[in-house]
């Protein structure tokens, strides 16, 4: 039975069938359901979204309401996806913050790099996770071929080895659902991935990501720059949410994250400002060497090797009550994102270091790729659970995701050392790259199109 808003209630212990079942109602799972609902080739196919929780209400994002501590830097390509799905106006009508510049700097040297908007309108938009989820969820009610079941906790999945059988999902309440294609969007600890028996490479960084909402003060009253400073324990980033509020993502050791969460608010703010401004870890010999090498760089400009205006991060004034939380960081990637009657998307397929909140953009790219592949399969009369077509998704998604994931992993490792030789090498490389305007603009455009 279908209720208003797309929610369905199945009779207990009954077995039902859907052409596609998506497990996971987060930012990626909801986007996948919306994409299939909007796909003209998929209108004859039934889609079920299983959400273990409850969708957030958009009423909680009214002006003046506290910001949520989980935010994402949404790339221009992802914004285009939201526009195609018809949810961008809904998201943007509540509260988003445009980022016109990204500034990255080092705690061990004077090296820095700046990305500004060029041909694009913005570097990114900073948006609260739940605002995206809620907007996508509301959109789902418009699609006649999509049903949503909230509070649906998966107990077990069964994925066949051949197309003769269907994939099955058993819920904790006893409901059993069969499907031609099971899409796992159920996060890092994916039950769908576990049931698929797909090989998965994973390791932990021995880091936790500490998030919080902070009130800030800028020199000009505007907060349009995303700031990231690399420290030996991990990067600390401030992502604008309004002219006076930023989201904090602070990667550090598990022990340090726990200590920081328990500090009184004023002490926490003092330590955060120290992490952003302190010069205690600067290596004078490295900075002197960088200065000398910069003078010999044939590509240097008048501002090369010199601090530019507007390169000081905002001063943190207070931290929002009860906004501090932390979670473990790690790397993971399924060797294949597909098997017979099963496809993985988002964190169920891959996991990367947050580094200023970019990871979910890869998940939305997965959605775009898989949506196209499934549309092609339906138009050609194929079985949507066939590896023949799903392999196209796997190939394109792996080719897209792995270079980004490996680059971020290497960058995180490179900046977790204070060895003078490595600090000098990375500092000169960063400053040299910052002076190459055309190359930097090309990279910015490339990353925006591939994240």
Swiss-Prot record:
Its EC number is 1.14.15.45, 1.14.15.46. Its cofactor is FAD. One of its GO terms (cellular component) is extrinsic component of mitochondrial inner membrane. GO terms for biological process: ubiquinone biosynthetic process. InterPro entries: FAD-bd (IPR002938), FAD/NAD-bd_sf (IPR036188), Ubi_Hdrlase_CS (IPR018168), UbiH/COQ6 (IPR010971), UbiH/COQ6_monooxygenase (IPR051205), UbQ_mOase_COQ6 (IPR000689). It is found in: Mitochondrion inner membrane. The keyword Oxidoreductase applies. It holds the Pfam family FAD_binding_3. Keywords: FAD, Flavoprotein, Membrane, Mitochondrion, Mitochondrion inner membrane, Monooxygenase, Oxidoreductase, Ubiquinone biosynthesis. It is a peripheral membrane protein. This protein may be expected to contain an N-terminal transit peptide but none has been predicted. FAD-dependent monooxygenase required for two non-consecutive steps during ubiquinone biosynthesis. Required for the C5-ring hydroxylation during ubiquinone biosynthesis by catalyzing the hydroxylation of 4-hydroxy-3-(all-trans-polyprenyl)benzoic acid to 3,4-dihydroxy-5-(all-trans-polyprenyl)benzoic acid. Also acts downstream of coq4, for the C1-hydroxylation during ubiquinone biosynthesis by catalyzing the hydroxylation of 2-methoxy-6-(all-trans-polyprenyl)phenol to 2-methoxy-6-(all-trans-polyprenyl)benzene-1,4-diol. NCBIfam families: COQ6, Ubi-OHases. Component of a multi-subunit COQ enzyme complex. HAMAP family: COQ6_monooxygenase. This is Ubiquinone biosynthesis monooxygenase COQ6, mitochondrial. The lineage of its organism: Eukaryota, Metazoa, Ecdysozoa, Nematoda, Chromadorea. The gene is coq-6.
